Amino acid sequence: MKTPFAYATALSALVLTFASSAFAVTVPPGVTLAASQEITRQVPAETESLDPAHIESWTGNTIALDLFEGLTRIDAAGAVVPGVAQSWTRTAPDTWVFKLRHDARWSNGQPVTAADFIYAWQRVLDPKTGSKYTVLVEFVKNAKAILAGKAPLSSLGARAVDPYTLEVTTEVPAAFFPQLAAMPTMAPVNRDVVTRFGGEWTRPGNFVGNGPYTLADWQPNNRLVGAKSKTYWNASKVVITKVTYLPIENDETAMRMYQAGQFDYTYSIPSGIYAQVSKQFGPELKTGLQIATYYYSLNNEDPLFKDKRVRQALSMVLDRDLLTQRLTADGELPMYGLISKGTQGAAVFKPDWAGWPMAKRVDYARNLLKSAGYSDAKPLTFTLTYNTNDLHKKVALFATSEWRTKLGVTTKLENVEYKVLLKQRHDGKVQASRDGWFVDYNDAMSYFDLIRCNSVQNDQRYCNPQVDKIVDEANQQLDDAERTELLTKAHDTAMNDYPMVPLFQYSAVRLVKPYVGGYTSSNYVDQRATQDMYLIKH
């Protein structure tokens, strides 16, 4: 990504400070607010957890943006603004100093201090916690050594200079660290509450957070309710007093609920009916690309998918243009690589064969399978697992039809709940599976966690030491152009190994009531906190 300053012979410090208006919701002049400021939002699945150490999904992250606050946060426009830290200084390529605000409080009234962040990050890395999402904390110095059991937790590169000053040393220069610090995984956790309640600390009645909302109710698979926190440092600027999240997996059901007034804000719309919904709802339909990728994860340790020829053949015959124009048809872009358009730090990947006529692609792919030992008499057969959702089902049916008609491949479809799929992928219990990645921060490194050797998010179980070597070299560069060139090379190298089957770049297409203020189309990372919204009189 583009760094905000250049290094001379001696590095000069950059201090970032912000006016209060930069991180408060702004109600335009002349707008009359509704008497009731209670909003209901759809999430596409039940959250796997409310514990920052165990949150992995879009749902979990979205809810956690309301219940917790990191050193920084992402505002309505997608910009990095102060959170618990009121300012930060980059004193060296690998060193950041964050000045914490003295009025930051936990929902139980205790002050939020630098020690709370250190405890939370060490907890993510502690094997006893069993976190599956350590990739963000791994940017902090010595984190990887701690995970490998080669260094103690106390060696983590985070130091409390005083209760309200946190010094962070990163493993490599990371200009994007303030973006990364906004993610729920990097949020502080209250040690007293975790110690007292153990695994039950996130239950209503036990829960203590430091975000603009506190947990009022949580009925798994039914609803989760957040109530405006009286102790939040910026509470006077938070307009919405209550947010209710309903986990509805079926987009058609969600749209009916929206029409009935049960939702103010949906996660998505049913696939393939964009024109119809646009005509019916007009400006209530919000659209925009996301820096996010929809793909099929292939277990590279599975006997079938150890062979690159098999993986490449499956990718080559999928008509992504047909998929995105006729089936999903919500503004998605065809993708052949992992990194999506708009990502800073690397270019997108498009193989030469993407421009071939489909007949030529099919012929080449059939020869790949033949050389791998498959034929009409001995067809390639495997199971594709996807989680419950209309879109995922439609895409799976499309892909299996393409593979069957063009390659003679037999694919068994397996549908499971999201939590089940998440565990199966991590445990290596699936052959091929539906997957997707929404960047945590706008930099190519957010994607590389999926393909680096031994990464906990590498469900593909793919490993190419050459890719890791190039990535490590790239992250030592202080010149943006050189870093981008190397990360692009690393991405191209990995994608030419076909560890997965990228399909398309997600679009953010959802219905938002006209009285919901604060929703913008420029938030490409789609991190939308309720505190940035307000309800207009209607």
What kind of region is each of these model predictions?
Residues 41, 220, 362, 366-439, ...:
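Ligand/substrate-recognition segments at binding pockets and active sites
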Residues 42-93, 206-209:
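N-terminal lobe/hinge region of extracytoplasmic solute-binding protein
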Residues 333-371, 389-394:
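Structural transition elements
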Residues 510-538:
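Long beta-strand-rich cores associated with HINT superfamily self-processing modules
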